[in-house]
Amino acid sequence: MKIKAKKSLGQNFLVDRNVINKIVEAGNILPDSVILEVGAGTGNLTESILEKKPKKIFIIEKDEKLVEKLKERFDNKIVIIPKDVLKVSEDLISTSKLIVFGNLPYNISTQILSKWITNDNQNNWFENYILMFQKEVADR
């Protein structure tokens, strides 16, 4: 069954292997790295992250159909948090500094970034962010 991106959730799935590889390389993932991936979609980025063998991968995914697809694809190799990223408290996840990957939805990109910057300044949760935005968000 082919999954279609939901415009209402601002979904845009990564499929270009070259782009995915560049994103993963930018993360400098080590064996003790703890990863947070926001909106894993169909799991193409997740698969490449797993090849680097990080300590743990947390995925926040709101779309119930994608959550099921990710569970089927990755079994117990990842921890899925089936919630809206804006409603997740990072202290539920953070046992060490996180490397955050995300192809952020246009409609909530600014809110997510503001939340993370504010929380990180207070709690120092994040080691690195590798985020993709639509050009319109970056221009703002």
Role assignments for model-derived ranges:
Residues 1-140:
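Catalytic cores of RNA-modifying enzymes
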